[in-house]
Each structure stands twice: as C-alpha cells, then as structure tokens.
C-alpha cells in the first residue's frame, strides 16, 4: 500500500486583523442591544449586503426579490455563470446590465427559486415576469434557503419529523396564502408541502423563528434584519460546507489548467479531514497527537484507498488564500495535481490562537 505524507508549509501565515467596530458605531439604527446587531455585523463583514447609507442599515425595511437573490449569490461566492438572462431564463423584465443579472441566472440554473416565481400557472408555462422589486414573503425566503442548502450539500435537508406550533402553516392556511400572494399560480398539495418542508426545516434548525407563539406569518414581507439573522444562523449550520465546496472548486480549477480530471468531495474523507483539522492546534504535524500516522484517520472513517496524501496549513483566513498557499509550495502542489488521486476531503477549524484557521486536505486514489 502506497502512502505519502508530504512536507508542511514552511511559512505559516499569522493572521492578525484589526477589529471593526460593531454595529453601534457603524449604524445608528442598529445600536448595541438591538436583537439583530450581531447578525447585521455578520452580513456586512461577510459582504452579503451593505447599509442603506453610511450610518443606517434600515433593519425593518423589506427585502425585494432581486436583493435576496443577490445576497444568496454572494453567499455562494458569486460563481461564474454561463449565458445571460435572455438565453438562460424566461424572464423579460430584467434590463441588460442590472446589478442582479448574474445572480438571477445562477439562481434559475440551480433551482433556487420557488415554483411560483418561475411558473405562470403551476404547470409548464414559464413566467416571463421576474418582478425584481416585489417584496419577498417570509415563506419564499425559507424556500430559497432550503433550496440553497440542497445546492450546497447535494442532498435534501432531513425532514423535521415534528409538528409545528403555528396555525398559519397548515395546509388550508397555506393554500389561502399562496392564492392571495400569487393569484396567477394554481397551487396544489405539492406546493403546500414544499412550503411546509422549508419552514419546518428552517424552524427546527433554529434558522427561522415564529412571529408569535402560534404564528409564523409566512406571507409577511421579510425584513433586512430578519434576513441577516437567518443567514447568520444558516452559516452556523452550513458555513463549513460552503468552505469545502470553495476549496474543491479552486483545486479543480488548478487541475483543469494542467489537463487533469476533477476530484470529487467524499463525505467520509471530509469526516477524516475534519478530525485531523481538530488535531492541528494541538500538534501541527502529519503525525497525530497520539503519535500515529495522519493516515490512520482514513481507516477510522472507513476510507479504502491505494494511495493517499495530506496537505495541512494554518493562518489562512479564506479558501482562496489557503489553496494559493498550497499551490505555491512544491510538495503541496504535487498532491493537488497528483493524477492518481480521485477524491478529496476538506477539514477546517478555527482556534483561539495566533493562527486562527487550520486547514486539512486528504486525498485518495
């Protein structure tokens, strides 16, 4: 059995940043103690959306369909899109060069939108009006986040398996909500089930709260503050998945430039890589803290392989930075561009030390 454990990055990057003052000093309408202040700081620092002025965030203002589409597109890393609105979507009310143009193409191509946004009648007739400035109901954003989680993970979120305490998300209530919000759309049981699955997932995952003990207000326009809070909570559940996908995309981009086949992200490899990442703050080495080889983590995760490699790094704050660091190190680059490797796992942890971020790539073939 061939096993390789290549050299560490010789220069570790020490990430020391200046803290940006939190919401109170930045936005006068989101003072310290505001229920969404931490979330507002989060979305602004992450670059998902900005204030409505230099000193205001407008937390209670509603979010339009175009705004929310752009926010999710940015969260996904603003991936390159192929085609245009005219060539890839049925929508005819989006001017060329609109700030949300690429976001709409991406969302349409990846099934982020609920059916009632893209279908005229609930059947095969496409809707030609996107209505970018229309306010977005809470149920629509829950549905878009649900679809976004599917986009990130490649699998539908697990069903909640518990009855919600809200009287306004019953089948009868949602039929009425859909009919009032989208009178052109002929909803059926499948549409109602979609909403129920999305809001149930969002509620049980702690992403969305009710507006009272017995109501979720699915038809109420979602506010900027509510979106900020939901995205911060979503990131707590799915943020690592997005980092893993970003590392994979960058690795495959480098492999494509060399004419190599892309790697796939394997769940059991990622499980092993995550274990290894958790060990690096204790011992930054290809040897585990208990003295065993790094590759014993593969066996523990049930990974079968003929050849394997590991890259590790510390101090890089983003997927782009760490992959660039690996690609500029001969041994790590050799792993990334190894034609014998077919699968990869990615691990990442943050530690309260000078390096902050610890990364692991595990490769097998």
Q: Which ranges hold each PLM region?
A:
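A short amphipathic alpha-helical interaction element
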Residues: 40-43, 72, 107, 145, ...
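Tandem repeat domain/solenoid detector
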Residues: 45-47, 224
């Amino acid at each position: 059995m061939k096993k390789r454990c290549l050299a560490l990055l010789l220069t570790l990057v020490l990430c020391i940043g200046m803290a940006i003052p939190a919401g109170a000093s930045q936005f006068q309408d989101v003072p310290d103690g505001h229920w969404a202040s931490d979330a507002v700081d989060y979305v602004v620092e992450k670059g998902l959306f900005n204030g409505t002025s230099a000193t205001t965030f407008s937390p209670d203002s509603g979010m339009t369909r175009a705004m929310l589409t752009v926010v999710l597109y940015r969260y996904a890393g603003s991936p390159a899109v192929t085609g245009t609105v005219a060539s890839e979507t049925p929508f005819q009310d989006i001017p060329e060069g609109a700030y949300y143009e690429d976001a709409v193409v991406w969302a349409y191509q990846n099934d982020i939108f609920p059916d009632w946004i893209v279908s005229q009648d609930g059947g095969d007739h496409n809707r030609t009006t996107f209505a970018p400035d229309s306010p977005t109901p809470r149920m629509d954003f829950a549905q878009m986040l649900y679809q976004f989680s599917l986009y990130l993970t490649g699998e539908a979120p697990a069903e909640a398996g518990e009855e919600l305490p809200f009287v306004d998300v019953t089948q009868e209530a949602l039929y009425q909500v859909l009919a009032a919000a989208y009178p052109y759309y002929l909803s059926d049981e499948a549409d109602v089930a979609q909403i129920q699955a999305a809001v149930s997932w969002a509620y049980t995952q702690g992403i969305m709260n009710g507006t009272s003990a017995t109501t979720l207000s699915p038809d109420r326009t979602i506010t900027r503050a509510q979106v900020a809070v939901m995205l911060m909570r979503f990131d707590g559940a799915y943020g690592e998945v997005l980092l893993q996908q970003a590392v994979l995309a960058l690795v495959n981009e480098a492999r494509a430039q060399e004419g190599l086949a892309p790697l796939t992200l394997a769940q059991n490899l990622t499980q092993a890589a995550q274990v290894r990442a958790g060990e690096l703050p204790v011992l930054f080495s290809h040897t585990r803290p208990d003295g065993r080889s790094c590759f014993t983590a593969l066996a523990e995760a049930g990974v079968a392989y003929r050849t394997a490699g590991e890259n590790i790094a510390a101090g890089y704050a983003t997927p782009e930075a760490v992959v660039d660091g690996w690609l500029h190190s001969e041994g790590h680059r050799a792993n990334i561009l190894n034609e014998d490797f077919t699968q990869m796992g990615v691990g990442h942890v943050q530690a309260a030390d000078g390096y902050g971020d610890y990364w692991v790539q595990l490769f097998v073939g």
